[in-house]
């Protein structure tokens, strides 16, 4: 069953509209890393972008909770 972003992923976003922000973050990070996202891109390159998104989201959440490591 497709989710909001049209994929078949079982991951559900808890905040409406977050998909657009995550997509923007994905393309910004890909640009920083020099990765051209797409079907021809290696799993390793795509994974590096996803991993960086996760790191930044965790860091942001930690800062919001007041216990963030800078």
UniProtKB/Swiss-Prot annotation:
GO BP term, pick one: sporulation resulting in formation of a cellular spore
Swiss-Prot/TrEMBL site (Cleavage) positions: 28-29
Keywords in alphabetical order: DNA-binding, Sporulation
Disulfide bridges in this chain: none
Molecular function (Gene Ontology), one example: double-stranded DNA binding
A Pfam family that the UniProt record links to this protein: SASP
Signal peptide: none
Miscellaneous comment in the UniProt entry for this protein: SASP are degraded in the first minutes of spore germination and provide amino acids for both new protein synthesis and metabolism.
Function: SASP are bound to spore DNA. They are double-stranded DNA-binding proteins that cause DNA to change to an a-like conformation. They protect the DNA backbone from chemical and enzymatic cleavage and are thus involved in dormant spore's high resistance to UV light.
Family the UniProt entry places it in: Belongs to the alpha/beta-type SASP family.
Protein name: Small, acid-soluble spore protein 1
The gene coding this protein: sasP-1
């Amino acid at each position: 069953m497709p989710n909001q972003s049209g994929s078949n992923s079982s991951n559900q976003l808890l905040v409406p509209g977050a998909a657009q922000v995550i997509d923007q973050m994905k393309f910004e990070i890909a640009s920083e890393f020099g990765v051209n996202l797409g079907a021809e891109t290696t799993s390793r390159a795509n994974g590096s972008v996803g991993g960086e998104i996760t790191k930044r989201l965790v860091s942001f959440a930690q800062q919001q909770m007041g216990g963030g490591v800078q």
